[in-house]
Each structure stands twice: as C-alpha cells, then as structure tokens.
Amino acid sequence: MTEVSVETSSAGSESPSIPLPLHVDPADLAAELAVVLSERVGEEYLLYERGGAWVLATGVRAMVELDSDELRVIRDGVTQSQRWSGRPGPVLGEAIDRLLLETDQLFGWIAFEFGVYRYGLQQRLAPRTPLARVFWPHGRIVVTRDEVRLFGASAGHRDDVLGVLGDGVPDVREASAVDVVADPSDYRDRVASAVGEIAAGRYHKVILSRSLEVPFALDFPSTYRLARRHNTPVRSFLLRLGGIRAVGYSPELVAAVDNDGVVVTEPLAGTRALGRGEVRDRQARDDLESNSKEIVEHAISVRSSLQEMTEIAEPGTAVVTDFMTVRERGSVQHLGSTVSGQLGTSNDRMDALEALFPAVTASGIPKAGGVEAIMRLDEGPRGLYSGAVVMLSADGGLDAALTLRAAYERDGKTWLRAGAGIIEESTPDREFEETCEKLSTLAPYLIARQ
C-alpha cells in the first residue's frame, strides 16, 4: 500500500504527500494525472515543468481574460467586464494581484500580440484579439522524482493519484509523424522579402515563421509524454485553456522574476541540427560556434536583451553571464546567453515582462521594426506561438517560458509552427532548413487521438 503523509503548506492548508515509486517517470505520471483529473471530465488545466518539478493546475476557480478591447474576470459564474486602454501590463497585473491576495499561484498564457502595444501597433489588431488568459486553479498537484504533493486538491484527487500509481501509467501508443518539408505558405519568398527590407535599412533582424498542419486530431497528453523523452527543454508545458490546447518544450525563458526581485532572461539565437550522430553533431557545433552569421545574430540579440534589462533594473545591475555557450534543445543546438538584473524599486514583474516581451529571439531587432514586419509578412496573428506560458506567485514571482517547439489546437484545427531569424546574410533555403530542424523537435512524436 502507498503511504500518504500530511504536511502544512506555507498558506496554512494541509498538503498530502505521496512517495513516488522509483520506476515511475514523473513526466509520465504528471501527464496521466492531467488525463484522469481534467481531460476526462472536460476541465481546463495547465501542466508546467520547472526545475525538476511538474506542477499540474486543475480546474478553474477564477479566470482573467484580457482581450485587445476588454478585460473580463470570471468567478463563481459571474463575469465582470470592463473596457481598457493604455498598456496591457498594468491592466493584467492589477487583476492578477487581486486574485493573489487569496491564493499562492496563478497560471496561464500570454499571446504574442500582448507585446505590440509597446510599439504603438495595437491599432492593427482585430477586435477581441486574445492577449492573455490567467487562472486560479481549484487544485495543484506537484510531481517530483521523489513524491507527489497535493495543494488545495480534494480527497477525490488524492484517491485518483493513488489509483494511477496502483494501476500503473499506461504505455504510450505509436507516433504518427508528419512531413516537415512542405511549404504551402511560400516561406522562402517571405524570407527573401525580409532580406530585401533589411538591406534597405528598415530593420536589422526579423523572425519569420511558418505553420505546418497536422492532418489528424492530436492526443496532447500522450504526445507530451513521448516527445518529452526526446527533448531537453528549459521548461515544458501541456495545457487546455482559453479555447486552445498546446503541448511544447520551451527552449528559453522570456522572463523570470524571483521573490528577491532578480530578473533573468535567456536569449537563444543561432541554430544547428542535433541528434544526427556524434560526428555530425560535433561538426554542426563547431560550425555554430564559428559561423559569422550565427555569431552576429546572437550578439545583437544579447545586446537588445541587455538594453531592455537596463530599462527596468537598478542602475549598474544589468549583466550578461554565460555568454554564447552552446545549449542543446532536443533536435537542435543553440548559442545561448543569460542576461540578469535587480528589478528597480519602482518596477514590478509586469514592467519586467513588458520590457522583455515578446522575446527578442522571436521578434526582431529593433523590436519595433521586427514586430511591424511580422504583422505584415507572417501568417496572421501568432496567438500563443512565440508568446509565453506563465506561472505567477503571491510573493511577486514570475516564470514566463517562451512558447516555441509546440503543437496547437483551436477550433478543430491542429498545427505546428516554427521560425528562423532573418538578417541580411540570410538565404531562403537555409532559413527554411532551420524551420525544419526546429519542427523536428516535435513532428516525429505526434500521437493521434483515439
């Protein structure tokens, strides 16, 4: 029999703890609990992996919905709505802070379009464009390699956890891979257009993306389990929230703010394939570390991130560490750096998020020109793609993972999406190849819904 111990959380509530058997993989268990506790009963949820812990937020006690023209707070079946104007950060932050007076953590996602306001491009958004969805869950379950801990969860949830552990996590089914080389969106032509605009001096860099349709309904939890075994993300996520499903393996942090006010962002720019054998991987790494195009792309991204950090950090505290090291992320390897600073006394986490969002590695340089070009040249609104999945805490903390290397489903359509950084030295064929490399993080591991 599995033993259950009970401790008291920092909020004063009891948090049952269940030891995790050695043979159980925590990622597999967390995804299966999402199925048992949320998928089967039609509840919204978000699973977020950070630092060796998988946090499953189940059910919606209250929801904050921010659109381009309206803020809604939904609680106990009652919707309070208001028009808003100005910057979205303070509007969302105030609604979030009110909920965090009553709970420890909130979870959600931020759309790419949240970031266009900083550059005065909001007039290009359609009415009711989704900007953010953040919720207060009914319960949280935290899975580590040692234990399962329940916060605010019902006795039924505890019994469900024990049931899954007793029955065992089922095996995942066979994947149905999709071909990543189709180019129905004329991606190469759009890259060529961007290179021309860069040569004309309109901007220095832009990230253009392409979507790849998945021709079957996706089993998101099973796909999460299988693909997680083949990826090394800085964060991973699985969610059904605000009308969208997503599963992904984030390669970098847009922003993290800890309870001491330390802000961190980790730009990755410069890419080569990985997983093609030791010799080819070493050759690709050597090329990545010596290729002038990749080095320039990374250096200007880090400079941009440092400038943004300086805006919201205490003077003299913004620094670059671990500069231009190779970081492996599933089917690709990147040049990566860490930029950090001490949050200024007059700023908060939403100021940090607005300054760093959208990620420089998913938008462009300068960001104003890059974002404007994306709104013209990319495939319609990005939504969750290149936005962020977020976890917020009552102590002022924020963890925002860049939403890349992911699959999405909305309104019966399922797709993948990937991009590449375009600079003047770019060639359409190489940038298309880079999108194929990034799509291969997930494309071989898609499992069809039964």
What residues fall within each predicted segment?
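Cofactor- and metal-binding active-site motifs of prokaryotic enzymes
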Residues: 26-63, 74, 113-161, 245, ...
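A residue-level signal for conserved active-site and pocket-lining positions in enzyme catalytic cores
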Residues: 64, 108, 141, 201, ...
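Short acidic (Asp/Glu) and glycine-rich catalytic loops that position anionic groups and cofactors
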Residues: 12-17, 202-205, 312-318, 331-334, ...
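Conserved hydrophobic core element of enzyme catalytic domains
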Residues: 335-338, 342-450
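An anion-binding catalytic pocket shared by soluble metabolic enzymes
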Residues: 50-67, 128-130, 134-140, 207-296, ...
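Cytosolic ligand/metal-binding cores
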Residues: 3-7, 74, 83, 145-164, ...
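Non-catalytic accessory segments adjacent to catalytic cores
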Residues: 2-8, 77-215, 440-450
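Extreme N-terminus nucleophile/cap motif
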Residues: 1-76, 83, 202, 206, ...
